[in-house]
């Protein structure tokens, strides 16, 4: 029983409550990947239909509607995306980009990139 109680704070951090909206306040660094055409038309966690050609992304915790600048740390290329989907916390990715955003970053071939996320101006 005690072990279960000790695990609860960890679960609260791993899975933000509905209504809890952690914002991008500072720089975040991690791995970006992208999800492609097979998801076209499927509903995202925000309820919108996935459009591979829109500049959108999935995040484990950022609020829907957040605008973030994603910059490839190797090349310096960047793109601004809107968060409209969720990534499971066990996914070990910082962000999952649409095809259009991945193309703009130049990561379609390798599929992943080491990136920095910062709030986009006007976000």
Spell out what each predicted region is.
Residues 2-123:
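Secreted/periplasmic proteins
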């Amino acid at each position: 029983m005690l072990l279960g109680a000790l695990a609860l704070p960890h679960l609260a951090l791993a899975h933000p409550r509905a209504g809890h909206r952690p914002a991008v306040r500072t720089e975040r660094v991690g791995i970006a990947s992208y999800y492609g055409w097979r998801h076209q038309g499927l509903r995202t966690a925000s309820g919108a239909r996935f459009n591979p050609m829109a500049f959108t992304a999935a995040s484990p915790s950022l609020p829907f509607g957040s605008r973030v600048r994603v910059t490839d740390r190797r090349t310096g290329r960047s793109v601004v995306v809107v968060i409209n989907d969720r990534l499971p916390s066990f996914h070990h990715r910082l962000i999952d980009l649409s095809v259009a955003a991945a193309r703009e970053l130049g990561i379609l071939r390798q599929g992943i990139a080491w990136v920095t996320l910062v709030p986009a101006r006007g976000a």
